[in-house]
Each structure stands twice: as C-alpha cells, then as structure tokens.
A protein has these predicted regions:
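Hydrophobic, small-residue-rich transmembrane alpha-helices and their short perimembrane loops
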Residues: 1-161
Length: 161
C-alpha cells in the first residue's frame, strides 16, 4: 500500500507529532530559561534550592500536556492497543487541526512561563518568604496551556474515526 493511500493516517500522525514536539520544545526552552536563573541563585545561596527547583519545573507541564494529547491521538487512531483505523484524509486533517492548540500554545506558553519563572526566581532570591506570591506569576501563564490542553482533548475525542 502506498503512502498516498494512507494520507489520513499521515495527517493524524503529524497532528500527534506536532502536539508532542512543539509543546515539548516549549517546555525545554522554558525549563532552560528558568534553570539558568535558578543556577545563579543556588550558587549564591544553596538553601533556596527546593524553592527555585519548583519554579524551574513549572514550564515542564506543557510538554506533559502535549504528550498526553499525543497518546490520546495515537489511541484514537488505533496505534496503541489495537489495529490502525482506516482514516480518510479529511478525518486525518481534522485530527491534525485538533492537535494544533496544545502544540502552538504549548510552545509559546512554555517559553513565556520560563521567562516568568525566571523573574519569580529573582523574587525568591531576594525575598524567600514571598515564594507563594512569586509562584502565582508563572501559574497565570499555565492557565492558557491548560485551556489549550482542554480544547485539544475535547476536539480529538469528538472526532469520529
């Protein structure tokens, strides 16, 4: 069977890949940005390690969300735990479109959350007692990643295969 006969599956797999790769890249960038700030703080005051580590981990959730949508997509098209579905190109494109929100928002919000977490790490460096307040700033960015996760999950699961 030629790949041209399986374009629906190709589009669906591309959707899963977009969700995982873009959201994962956003998390990697964000965690890296926050990690650079955290390293400087821990060098000066090792007692702040736990607090800045929590801040550094916050941008990592976008990658988890993308992976979740990727798994749901692979399960939906039958590549996990069953035979592969026979997808027409239109259905494959619908699945690809359903995966875009978490991929795109995960990439952008992961980086933005890393920048916000780095600023919050600066707050913790100067005033460790303000940890709770500082954590709210990167958590606000998280809201939009959660909204994108929700719409991608709802859209992928609503598509009839």
């Amino acid at each position: 069977m030629s790949i041209w006969n399986d374009m629906g599956m190709v589009y669906a797999l591309l959707g899963a890949a977009v969700a995982v790769f873009l959201a994962g890249a956003g998390s990697a960038i964000g965690v890296g940005i926050a990690g650079q700030a955290a390293s400087g703080v821990v060098t000066e005051d090792p007692s702040k390690f736990a607090k800045v580590l929590i801040m550094q981990l916050l941008p990592g959730t976008q990658g988890i969300y993308g992976l979740l949508v990727g798994f749901i997509t692979l399960s939906k098209i039958g590549l996990l735990g069953g035979g592969a579905a026979d997808l027409d190109p239109q259905t494959g494109l619908l699945i690809l479109a359903a995966c875009l929100p978490i991929g795109i928002v995960g990439l952008i919000s992961g980086k933005a959350q890393g920048q916000t977490a780095a600023a919050a790490i600066g707050i913790v460096a100067k005033k460790p007692e303000q940890f709770g307040k500082a954590m709210l700033f990167p958590a606000m960015v998280e809201t939009y990643a959660i909204l994108a996760l929700l719409i991608s999950i709802l859209a992928v699961t609503a598509i009839q295969v």
